[in-house]
């Protein structure tokens, strides 16, 4: 692969446009580096449909903030380009981690075409905030060692080999993004592989003041979502790890077993 097509060779130049992962919503779950970028910014273009305004508290007085909720790509790039040309510090603030359903590659491409340097600061994605809220581990020894992050096909299609039915056959821990409005279809597909009585959960607005975590069985998932009137900003979580409590944990990692030797313990 030609790395020049996926990397910005000028990303280390002073004053690049900074793509920042805002985290799942709690202003304190942004990274220290992301917080610093906001504090130093002159312009913040934030994904207003998903990033809570509470994140903007890290900006200094006088920083211009623009919600991109109603903007298209050309408008967003135009704002960044104009501010950069004036020597301003520009932050593009995305929800969660920018690399996951953030549509940042097309923005980076547009900046690169204009010889505008950029850099990316990662963030905490909602799947990990959901695990923290539920008190679970996605990769329990001998239960599941794989985590799938995916979405249902909607207006944005997914590759045929990545459709939910194909992925569900692995019966791994799975977190489904951007698909709560398709919960009826999702539940039917998941039941075919995981079974009707498989444990699942819906994580709504994780880490935010109105967070809700709802546990259910797959056979009840669709109706539960309707009863709770959840229509957006929610994850669907499924997997055997949701059915293991502390009292019934039989399989433990070798890492902390007394007789397990490794480079730091013999």
State where each predicted segment sits.
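Class I SAM-dependent methyltransferase SAM-binding "motif I" and its flanking Rossmann-like core
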Residues: 26, 97-170, 212-215
